[in-house]
Amino acid sequence: MQQLELYHIAFLGLAIVLEIIANIFLKMSDGFRKVWLGLLSLLSVLGAFSALAQAVKGIDLSVAYALWGGFGIAATIAAGWILFGQRLNAKGWIGLVLLLAGMVIIKLA
């Protein structure tokens, strides 16, 4: 088991934030028609993976990746709702609840 420190948790948080930013820029780039926003998206993804690489030095890969992906998806759904007026249907909400439950189970394992 690796030594978990606040440092690793902070890098995981940064990776999550950068993933959300990347997704927002990707949506705003309109399929890379706005090249500079597409490039900002790519840079954000690179930053997210770099931060995740630092996080997994102290957090098990399976836990870090599940939390990164899960929180990234949940927050991207919220950002889509707030910024772009996108709404989930009933199946989408069920999927989000299952995703969050899975993250809790993985963290407790």
UniProtKB/Swiss-Prot annotation:
Q: Does the keyword DNA-binding apply?
A: no
| Pfam families for this protein | Multi_Drug_Res
Q: What is its main location?
A: membrane
Task: Name the InterPro entries on file.
Answer: Small_drug/metabolite_transptr, Small_multidrug_res, Spermidine_export_MdtI
List keywords of the entry alphabetically: Cell inner membrane, Cell membrane, Membrane, Transmembrane, Transmembrane helix, Transport
In terms of domain of life, where is this protein from?
Bacteria
The compartments listed are:
Cell inner membrane
* One GO CC annotation: plasma membrane
Subunit annotation: Forms a complex with MdtJ.
State the similarity comment. Belongs to the drug/metabolite transporter (DMT) superfamily. Small multidrug resistance (SMR) (TC 2.A.7.1) family. MdtI subfamily.
Q: What is this protein called?
A: Spermidine export protein MdtI
